[in-house]
Curated annotation (Swiss-Prot):
BP GO terms, sorted: protein import into peroxisome matrix, receptor recycling; protein unfolding
Naturally occurring in which organism (per UniProt): Cricetulus griseus
UniProt-recorded name of the protein: Peroxisomal ATPase PEX1
Enzyme Commission identifier(s): 3.6.4.-
Primary localization: cytoplasm
Hydrolase in keyword set: yes
Lineage top rank: taxon: Eukaryota
GO molecular function terms noted in the UniProt entry: ATP binding; ATP hydrolysis activity; protein transporter activity; ubiquitin-modified protein reader activity
Source species taxonomy: Eukaryota, Metazoa, Chordata, Craniata, Vertebrata
Cross-referenced Gene3D superfamilies: 1.10.8.60, 2.40.40.20, 3.10.330.10, P-loop containing nucleotide triphosphate hydrolases
Family, as annotated: Belongs to the AAA ATPase family.
InterPro entries membership: AAA+_ATPase (IPR003593), AAA_ATPase_domain (IPR050168), AAA_lid_3 (IPR041569), Asp_de-COase-like_dom_sf (IPR009010), ATPase_AAA_core (IPR003959), ATPase_AAA_CS (IPR003960), CDC48_domain_2-like_sf (IPR029067), P-loop_NTPase (IPR027417)
Binding of ATP, residues: 601-608, 883-890
UniProt gene name: PEX1
Gene Ontology cellular-component terms listed: cytosol; peroxisomal membrane
Amino acid sequence: MWSGDRSAAAGSGGAVVTVAFTNARDCFLRLPRRLVAQLHLLQNQAIEVTWDRQPTYLSWVEGRHFNDQGENVAEINRQVGQKLGLCSGEQVFLRPCSHVVSCQQVEVEPLSADDWEILELHAVSLEQHLLDQIRIVFPKAVVPIWVDQQTYIFIQIVALMPAVPYGRLETNTELLIQPKTRQAKENTFPKAGDAHGQFRSYGQEQKGMSKELQTKQLHMNTEGIPGSNETDPKVPSDSSWKAHWWTMLGSMFSLGPDNRQATSWGSSEISVFKTMQSQDVPLDSVFRVCRVQPPSVRDTPATSVFHKHCTVHVFPWDQEYFDVEPSFTVTYGKLVKLCSPKQQQGKTKQSVMSPEKEKHPLESPNHKQIGSDHTEEAGEACVLKVVWNGLEELKNTTKFTKSIEPLHLGKVWIPDDLRKRLNVEMHAVVRITPLETTPKIPRSLKLQPRENLPEDVSEDDVRTGFSSWLQQSATTMLPLVISKEERIKLGIKDGLKEFSLSVVHCQEREKGRGETAFVLSAVLLRKISVQVLLEPMIREENSEEIDFLLPFLKLNSLGGVNSLGVSAMEHITHSLLGRPLSRQLMSLVAGLRNGALLVTGGKGSGKSTLAKAICQEACDGLDAHVEIVDCKALRGKRLESIQKALEVAFSEAAWRQPSVILLDDLDFIAGLPTVPEQEHSPEAVQSQRLAHALKDMIKELVSVGSLIALIATSQSQCCLQPLLVSAQGIHTFQCVQHIQPPNQEQRCEILQNVVKNKLGCNINKSSDIDLQRIAKETEGFVARDFTVLVDRAIHSHLSRQPVSTREELTLTTSDFHKALHGFLPASLRNVNLHKPRDLGWDKIGGLHEVRQILMDTIQLPAKYPELFANLPIRQRTGILLYGPPGTGKTLLAGVVARESGMNFISIKGPELLSKYIGASEQAVRDVFTRAQAAKPCILFFDEFESIAPRRGHDNTGVTDRVVNQLLTQLDGVEGLQGVYVLAATSRPDLIDPALLRPGRLDKCVYCPPPDQVSRLEILNVLSASLPLAGDVDLQHMASVTESFTGADLKALLYNAQLEALQGRLLPGGLHDGGSSSDSDLSLSSMVFLNHSSGSDDSAADGESGLDQSLVSLEMSEILPDESKFNMYRLYFGSSYESELGNGTSSDLSSQCPSAPSSVTQDFPAAPGKEPLFTQHPMFRTPSQEGYQELTQEQRDQLKAEISIIKGRYQSQSGEDESLSQPGPIKTSFAISQAHLMTALAHTRPSISEEEEKDFAELYENFQNPKKRKNPSGTVFRPGQKVTLA
């Protein structure tokens, strides 16, 4: 039973655990993760273990494969537990020690003579693995030390310095070992103070020879055993050492004659090699070449084993291991590169496939492990040193694997020079196998430079440099093992030169063609002849770069997409298990199980650049391989070719995992058809089949647990096949990032980064650029537009001021203004924008309240966006204009678009409707997409009642679906940003009421017929450019035009203008032919009425229409003589002109009375009267039936009459010279009051009194629904469709 005090201590800073024995080959106490967190333990922290005996102190590790049964269980090696007096199942109390002292010196003693002999024979192994087995020691402790997999010895801790109850072994701790011989006596052991052995730190070179025979102690070094075993004459003879020497001498004579010299010469090096090769390391393992140098290698001194010649470093996948202190094992092995699927495919194309390979075609690398039956080695194997970091972790990986084994056992880092020499690219796969044969000792070496040497370099300089290099690269405890030919770099004349080191003769002749390795050391070099050649050897130049460097920008160099980039990078990091938290929590959903990333955005929005920047960050930060598939380039190819390209990319990514696959512009090969008519086209069928194939590839990678992340780009999520974006089944894309059009702040960032990337300078340092002003003027621009804009600005600057270097180029705001002139952004290309007429608010008469509402709702927010952006409530963006026809609704929409400076898109209602299911809704979506792309934009729907009637009244259901789509677009979740919706109708009662609720078209503005004051304003506006006579009284005209709308007043002025034209051109027709009312030539009979009930209303076209007619009248006065025949055609047709020789019939055929452009349509001839001629000649064009050729008498008569008309016309209009001179309209051509009254007599209002009453009642009921007559008296017929909206 635990006492009360101990229970209290357990609750405050300790824990009670149950001891369980294991077969682990170390002295660490293994604790479950929950207990580690409970005790707040730190790395290398000591733990006090207390039970019924004296407390002991142990070091701890976390049990990675711990079997937690719900209680605190601490595992420890059986031999350690028994020596401490523990029993399996016994309960002990654990308490973390707050402070641990590092030991400077530790004195130990083997427990028996057998232990001493075993320790003496396995000194090298113990030096390399001692710290892997024990870290915390305390006096009088007896601990086991393992020298191999099955053998262990016991040592006792004698004393610690400084004298502390417990301490920690460090890499620089000196370890004094007292030898224990079989005939040892008490007086034969020296004191601890006289010992010379020490335990040196990692990376330190040996500085002196050992004197272990003199002191009877072992001199241990963490990097190797002593460099030689030289004897001292002062060493006393000992029977045990004599027996040792006799035994070694007998073994020498027992060997063959060829092995005697090898035993006496280089025996220590061969012995060390065999000891190192006896280490328990993974055999024939596959590793992935990593890019980043691990911190454990980067932080070590340059003299350590990590930086020796031909040394590779193996690490486990867990990157957390890089943060702990390095404990490594060094062995010798062979490294060979394995061909990837793409490289194997390239070799297959270059050579003819053998019959064996035809039977076994290339397989996908998604298998459990790599075997020699389906992999191909690239190049010859290279002999090198292998530094195993985290060996226990690597062993656990092979031992505790899941049902599906990983492709690679771990990572291997190869120095750049060695990697390039072996032609191994980044993220390649290599196989490391142990060196099975014993290395031989060379007799002769040859050194030859691979580059030109300075002239003053001699052979002695090369030999000196080689000797220095060999002393740094090899010691007796860690000899250098090389292949038959190596490339080394020697320091010659204060510079590094590359040499080729080759073995000319070896001590033993090769038997067969087996693998050959040679051992070198500074001691062996004394008896090896070195041949030096100063002439450089001829080598093949290989200028190709084996590493493919991604030429992409990083996320911090883009601008405007920082939040999107961070979010997308978080998804990729979790998918590739790039963080400790990801490895702990998301190991079951790694790779594509976490879903793919979809980046969407419009054309030129930068989605491909963002995706490539994410790939660049993943390559740099996560050491991921990147495979890019340009789907746009695959469009139009055969299905088999596209599928093969995708399979190669996926296989390559699986081979080099962790990897990132980028499918750029995926909608080009796996997208939906643009129009419903193409749903069953061959392209659509192929796109659907490719989507199925892509889905199958992803499922296969998910099933084998590949560490692959997938990124795809598309214009929108709806553009892809439903199989890839369906909400049912497996979600392919679980992270969707949409790039919105940039706001002003984002445009500043984009512009700043584009200039910085192109010019290499920071734009903030230039005070000549006003970024805020340029960003405000580039509304609607996307990333690609800014790239083109900067190019145009640079071109503008260079054309103005040439520079010689890029640093001298300094852009200014004026350069950007010149670049913006005439530049159309990509978002506005292929967008049907309707340019409003050049009219302002001053060109509108009346409608003051309506104008003010439009200004407050649309114009002011467009001019002051920052002010309105701070409003807490969402501002109004939809307005419905309703009123009788001709009251100026269309005119208001155009004027507000021009005054606000926004883009203008006008939609006629019926043009959105289609007979195909879904086409009408798609047309509505496309319209709003166009408006979003062109924002700030005004979207104007004319004849709105035709596309948005009440639901339930359409037998086909087309308009019902259109209304539903409009409701979604007007008041969706995202809302409209920068798009204002205007709708015009004369029948608001027919519109679905759901569209008129707040948040949609929430403001209904009534455009009433003009009263007398408004009519006077309209007449003043319309007649501003007309030549009015002094007797014109517009006030009187406004009073006598009751019920006239703006369109009617426009028609009135048209007719008055034509009356003035008749009096100007044909004044005799009003007097010679009788009264004007009886004359058929009177142009007053051509009245212009506005009977349309649609949107060509009001002065929207009136002002410009009058201006155009005035221009035609002005031109009639200044026409040249050739154009005067248009008047003759008014009466005689074009055939007479041909007869007079004024043009061929082909040239004048377009001017015949039947042609649309004929002037006779505007001024029709009067067939019944002939006031200007004494005779009535009837002539027809040659194309008309009944044509007769004119006689000479008829021609003479016509010429005489034409001359009379010409003389009368010239006398009225003045000299011919004045006709060719442009000038203002003459005062003789003026619209008088009589012309207005004559036109009024033939002009009637477009809306009758009865229709006006109906409209008034209709609008009254619409504005006040509660005042409707008999609101509940409606009788429904059986089968009638109604709506509850």
